[in-house]
């Protein structure tokens, strides 16, 4: 069950100053927006704000830093947002996801994974994109089994909803199957890629895998299909196809 929180109100005069800073930020006057926000959290100002108001000030500060591509500073402000007590649960959940993304942007993979796992614990309905993000994190730290589990989950979720998973999701799965020498699963993924994202590399690689499995008829059929689409532009590929024809006779 979801915890209930008693979030303090955002008072009108505070809201008006935040709106003023927001308007400046949208006009890309980041310095002007920062002046207002810094005044709000100066020694005197800070004492007058409740936790939810402070969280909103830090949240807008984080946005300003992000807009200037100062990711470490943006991260520090987002950490301040979630350190405020009794902020709305949705605000904390969204901020935790942003924190994870910011770690990944800075290639701090393990911290990103840890932040994302904390987000997963709080989120009742994680989406497929979050599982892919986690898979990419695990891939970067070479935890390939965990990467595969998560990208498989994402693909299954999307397919189950009648949506087409992204090409890069399939490619991550394909790489991970190859790495563990699960060539049957790699072939399944390649055959899916051929249907939805037909590119030369998928036809040629699938043909090669059928060759590894000593399934020459399929190996030849895929090379022929690639040839008919004008994909075979290297002489070595045409030689391979000629050999397959000779063996097939």
Predicted features, each with a name:
Residues 24, 65, 103, 138, ...:
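Residue at a conserved register position within TPR or TPR-like alpha-solenoid repeats
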Residues 27, 68, 106, 141, ...:
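Structural motif corresponding to the intra-repeat A-B loop/turn of tetratricopeptide repeats
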Residues 3-9, 41-50, 82-88, 117-125, ...:
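Solenoid-like repeat scaffolds
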Residues 10-19, 50-58, 88-98, 123-133, ...:
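Generic helix N-cap/helix-start motif at coil->alpha-helix transitions
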Residues 30, 71, 109, 144, ...:
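TPR-repeat structural position
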Residues 1-79, 91-94:
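N-terminal leader/linker segments that initiate helical-solenoid repeat arrays
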